[in-house]
Structures are given as C-alpha cells and as structure tokens.
Amino acid sequence: MNSIFKKIKNYTIVSGVFFLGSAFIIPNTSNLSSTLYKELIAVLGLLILLTVKSFDYKKILIPKNFYWFLFVIFIIFIQLIVGEIYFFQDFFFSISFLVILFLSFLLGFNERLNGDDLIVKKIAWIFIIVVQISFLIAINQKIEIVQNFFLFSSSYNGRSTANLGQPNQFSTLILITLFLLCYLREKNSLNNMVFNILSFCLIFANVMTQSRSAWISVILISLLYLLKFQKKIELRRVIFFNIVFWTLVYCVPLLFNLIFFQKNSYSTFDRLTMGSSRFEIWPQLLKAVFHKPFIGYGWGQTGVAQLETINKSSTKGEWFTYSHNLFLDLMLWNGFFIGLIISILILCFLIELYSSIKNKSDLFLFFCVVAFFVHCLLEYPFAYTYFLIPVGFLCGYISTQNIKNSISYFNLSKRKLTLFLGCCWLGYVAFWVEVLDISKKNEIYARQFLFSNHVKFYNIENYILDGFSKQLDFQYLDYCELKDKYQLLDFKKVAYRYPNASIVYKYYSISAEMKMDQKSANQIIRAYSVIKNQKIIKPKLKFCSIEY
C-alpha cells in the first residue's frame, strides 16, 4: 500500500513540474493578457507541488525575514484603502505575486531542510527538455519550414524568441537552464559528453536571441565565479567558456546573414551600438518618482505614473506598463523612500546569499537567480509567474545556508498551511471563473460591435477582474449609457489605466460637461498625444443627444 502511495506522490510531483515547464512552450492565446494562460499553468504546478509536499514534510519552517513580506503587503493594503491603487484587480495581482513568490521560497526552503533535492533535479530536467524544444522552435523561426497555430513562427527583428515571444525572456530561460545543467553535472547526474553537447546547444540558442542582458549576465557571473573559486583550473574553465560564448556571439549572426539572403539578424556591432527606448524613459520616470516620493502611484501602476507626469519633451510613441527596471518600478509604486528600502533589502539578501555559498552546486543555482535579476534591471521578468516560481524556489533552496541557529526561523503548523493552501486553491478557481466570464463578455461585446455601433450592456459581477470588466464597458458602450452607470472617478481611473482614443475622449467629455477634474482630463489628452506621437488636438465633446 505504501508503495502505491509513493508512486502516486511521485507522479503528482512530476505533473506539477511538468505544468511549470510547459508554461514556457505553450502559445500566447489569451485576449486579456498574452501570457495569462502560461502564468496560470505555472501557478497550477506550484500549487500541486506544495499540496503534495505539505503532507510529506514532518515540519514546515519559515525564515524570520518573512516579516518583510508582511511589511510590503501592509503597504499595498494602505494604497488600496487610500485609493492609490485604482482597481481591486491590481491589488489582487500584486498580493498574488507576492504570495506566489513566498510560497515558492517556502517550498525550496523546506525541500532543502528535509534533505531532498528531488524537485530541483526534476525542474532542471524539465527545463532542459523545454529549452531543447524551444531551440527547435527558434531554428524554425529562422528557416520558416513549419507554420502552425501552436508555434510562434516569426522572430523579433531577426532575434529568436521561441514560444515566449520575447528574445530576452528566451535568453533568461536558457541561462537558467544552462546553470541547472551545470548543477546536474556537479551532482554527477549526467556524463561529460551529454553535458558538453547540451551546453553547446544552450549557448548557441542563447546567442540566437542576441540579448544584451545575457551579455551582462555572462560577464558578471564569470567574475562572481572567480571570486569564489580562484584556482588556475577554474580560471581556465571560465576563459574557455567565455571564448566559446563570445566567439558564437560574433559568428552566429554572420552565419545566418550569409545563409539567408534577407539578412534577418542584426550584427553583433549593431546590437552593441543601437540605443533603447528604456534609456529614454528612465529620466522621465525618475522625475515621476520625486513627484510622489512618499506613497508612490500604487503597485503595478507604472503606466499611471508616466501619464500623470508626461510633457512635450517626454519620450514619444511609447507607453510603458513597467519601467524596465525592478528598482525603479518599486520606487514608482511605493514612493522613493519605501522603494529604496525594499531595493536595499533585495540587494542585501542577494549579497548574503552569495556570501553563504560554500560549494559549486549551490553557486550554479545562485547563478540562475543572478541571470534573472540582471534581466530585472533591464526588463520585467518579475511580472511573469513562470519566472517568479522557479527563481523563488531556488532562492529558498539556497538560503538554508544562512541558518545558524533555531532563532533564524519559526515553525508553521500543518493545519495553518493546509488552511492557507485551501484558500489559495479557492482563489485560483475563482480567478479562472472570472477569466471565463470576462472572455465571454469580451466576445459578446465584440460580436455586437461588428454589426452595430450600439452595444448592449452585459452585466456580470466581477469581484476580482473589475479593471478588465470596466475597460470593456468603456471601450464598447455609448457615452450616455456610461454616464448613467459610472461616476466621474471611474472615467478617470479607466482612462489612466487603459488609455486609448475612445476611453480618453469619453473621460474628457464628461469632465468638460460636469466642469470638474478638468486639469486631469487635459493632462491625459496631452499625455495620450505624446504616447501616440501625434499633435495635441482637443477632441470633440460627446453629448447624449448625438449618436456617434
């Protein structure tokens, strides 16, 4: 009987890891968010692993620094209460991502304390399989042999993306997998020949992304490795790795441009010298930080910060939902002072983690985290659960090295964990129900709009996805019907969170008609003109007596 239960447990763990890995290769299909289904599948994998392991562990331990999570959650609650966070949906997402990060950390932390490396090895193997499949998809993007709904068949300006649809995300996945491969080799889980072949494939795939964040990661990781291990043989290994990597960085784009006449790859020199819009937006967003230095603009509302502070000299033709820098986002969301404190805590945690590492296997796992955080300084992989979960798990797994005595952690009763996991499962199911409701509402509105300018109001109770629901209403419904159903503040919130011509003009019209909040309405008209790179034109006011 015990053997049957053990098999069931092992199969369930495999299924959880499988869901986590499959999030990287399923296509982007949701109308609400291009990565929604991928992220939900990753969360499903985490919940399965936690549920199985909660019965397996004799005791569940939580580090004392968990209180910092509670501090951040408290800040988000305050922002919701005072109205800085516009929709419950944004509050829910922010809390959920922190809870997901904490649960991932908790799983890794207790997995290591219980002397088990089963999950980390299974994650390593599933990532290796996923990246090899993604490598084939990336090759197909270059040669375009197979066209299929399930394949992201076009590259990103000649840069490989696989089914992630974004080259830097694909690059970070490859780097994480490369160091998980090194971890397996260090644990003697594969031989030298297999290791060398897979390593070369991973490096080649990474070079195809032409990711500059990967270049920075390789330089930083090489230095961190040599700081830990300073023997001559280690120096030779680092030099050899860098020779292979940088040679491929230079040669692979030339090779593809030679083979394919359309020259669909940037040269390495082009990638090295070309600019980036993120460097143009950062100065403007830094000004926005000091515009609200104490409480910020609310978690997840970087776009609001940009719209509120934009002017004629700001970056044109760009609207950012994230600043492309984790620390800048934290300052925008929380204000300069609290954001700076959280940023320093993150850096201190990483430095302490690195200092506590005593062996190569842990160092390779730490390099997975480093690759992720370097990417966080140039983009926003922290906004995707399929990255957050494995990185949180690895942080928890490595951080057990910091435990010096029993004061460093406290026990969590299985009853409390079971209750909490039960709430997480209920929240997960409730979220899926609302996703289906919103998808239905979007389909109904879109179908009606095909045949008539007048769309009938579709009323559904949305307790979680209130922002998406209101966005659909303001996008499709007549101005007069919106006036009857919503307040001026609702017009403002939707316009600043989901700016498009229809929604912005409706907000401007009601503000002018009521002769209230006109400064904010004029600001978003100016801001919208800048992000669309158009001349500032005051829109025609909408009136109930006129159909449009």
UniProtKB/Swiss-Prot annotation:
InterPro entries: O-antigen_ligase-rel_domated, PglL_A, WaaL-like, Wzy_C_2. Disruption phenotype: Loss of glycosylation of the ComP protein. It is found in: Cell membrane. Its EC number is 2.4.-.-. One of its GO terms (molecular function) is glycosyltransferase activity. One of its GO terms (cellular component) is plasma membrane. It is a multi-pass membrane protein. The keyword Transmembrane helix applies. Specifically catalyzes the glycosylation of the pilin-like competence factor ComP. This is ComP-specific O-oligosaccharyltransferase.
